[in-house]
Structures are given as structure tokens and as C-alpha cells.
Amino acid sequence: MESSNLYSKLLNAPKNAPVFLSQNLEADFIVKAYTFGLFPWTSKPVTWWCPDPRCILIPNQIHIQKNMKKFINLYQIKLDYDFLKLITLCRDTRSQSWIDDEFITTYYKLFTQGYAHSLELYENNELIGGIYGLILGKVFFGESMVSIKKNASKVAMIKLCDLLKPYDFIIDCQVYNQHLEFMGAHNISRKEFLNILKEKCNQESGFKNFKDLIT
């Protein structure tokens, strides 16, 4: 299907339901799908979503609450250090998770290809939280966060915003929740989001390697 036809179909797709289903997750398809605002949410079958409205966060609009300041420098930050361990932790800390073995294998492949990235938090060399997602152009497509210690996922988001501020990124948060709103995220229309992707996904990120943003 041509890009223009897919764009038109997505504008008229269900607002709060899967756009389509697929039997498997394929790395190449995921990259293409993300550029059209699609993301997988469940498996067997894989459900693909493009919700309207869409929740995003602009890094320089991050809200840091007063009670968070004591946590910001409490943990060690590592980038792309142990992606596989982080995504597995995201699965294992949830009683019900769409992150199955196929999902982990596919996203780890995207990591080895340079698309998927992780920001990890450590305390005494123990992984205690973080966030992972895909970087395409100047968009960080957030997939999942995890927090073993208090406020670790919030610290991860704050640190991610700090790193991406100089590069004019947006962060795709997918679906609104109050936790994200407290941090400065907000909803925009699907049409506006897709138009942003047209521009941002075709730009250079501004850095060579994500892991080198922390020296």
C-alpha cells in the first residue's frame, strides 16, 4: 500500500481499538509501522494500534516535582548497557504482560540493528528501573518503563528528557495516563501526531550513538 493511502486510512481508523491484526512480529515491519504511528500492544494475534488522541512528551516541557529532586541523582544511569535484561525485567514485573518471548526476541533484534535503545538505572550494580523504545529520526517511541525502587521510572523519564532536549526530539508515550500527565505529557490529535512523524522521522537524530550521550 502506498504511503498516502495508508495515511488516509489511518486518519479514519478506530480511535480506541486495534487498527489491524497480524500473526507475527517482524523487525522490519515494526520500523515501518512506527513511522506511521502504529505500535503492537498484544500478541497471538498481534494487535496494532494508532490511538486518537495520542500522548506525547516534549523533553523541554518535562515537569519535575519538588519531591523528585532528591531522587534524580540517586541512581547510576547507563545507556544501551543491558537492553535484554531491561526488557525482560519489564515483562517479569507485571502479572499480565504482552511482552512475550517473541516480543523480546524481535525487539532485541531491533536493538542489535540500532533502532531500539534503553536507558537503565542501577543501584549498587543492580538494575532497578529504566525505559526502552525505538529512535527513528527525532522521535523516541517509548515502549515500556519499569521501576523496582521508588520513583525509578520517573527518574528514567527525566534523564531521557535531559539527554534529548538539545536535539529537538519528541517522545511518543502512546496512551495517556495520569502519571505521564504529572510529568508534562499531553494529548494531541492523531492527525497532528502523524504530521509530526512525517517531519521528525525523516530528520537526522543529531547524534551518532545514543549510548554516547552519557560520557
Curated annotation (Swiss-Prot):
GO terms for cellular component: cytoplasm. It is an enzyme of class 2 (transferase). The keyword Protease does not apply. GO terms for biological process: protein catabolic process. Its main location: cytoplasm. One of its GO terms (molecular function) is leucyl-tRNA--protein transferase activity. It is found in: Cytoplasm. Keywords: Acyltransferase, Cytoplasm, Transferase. It catalyses: N-terminal L-lysyl-[protein] + L-leucyl-tRNA(Leu) = N-terminal L-leucyl-L-lysyl-[protein] + tRNA(Leu) + H(+); N-terminal L-arginyl-[protein] + L-leucyl-tRNA(Leu) = N-terminal L-leucyl-L-arginyl-[protein] + tRNA(Leu) + H(+); L-phenylalanyl-tRNA(Phe) + an N-terminal L-alpha-aminoacyl-[protein] = an N-terminal L-phenylalanyl-L-alpha-aminoacyl-[protein] + tRNA(Phe). Its EC number is 2.3.2.6. InterPro entries: Acyl_CoA_acyltransferase (IPR016181), Leu/Phe-tRNA_Trfase (IPR004616), Leu/Phe-tRNA_Trfase_C (IPR042203), Leu/Phe-tRNA_Trfase_N (IPR042221). It comes from the Bacteria. It holds the Pfam family Leu_Phe_trans. The keyword Transferase applies. Functions in the N-end rule pathway of protein degradation where it conjugates Leu, Phe and, less efficiently, Met from aminoacyl-tRNAs to the N-termini of proteins containing an N-terminal arginine or lysine. Belongs to the L/F-transferase family. This is Leucyl/phenylalanyl-tRNA--protein transferase. It comes from Campylobacter jejuni subsp. jejuni serotype O:23/36 (strain 81-176). The lineage of its organism: Bacteria, Pseudomonadati, Campylobacterota, Epsilonproteobacteria, Campylobacterales. The gene is aat.
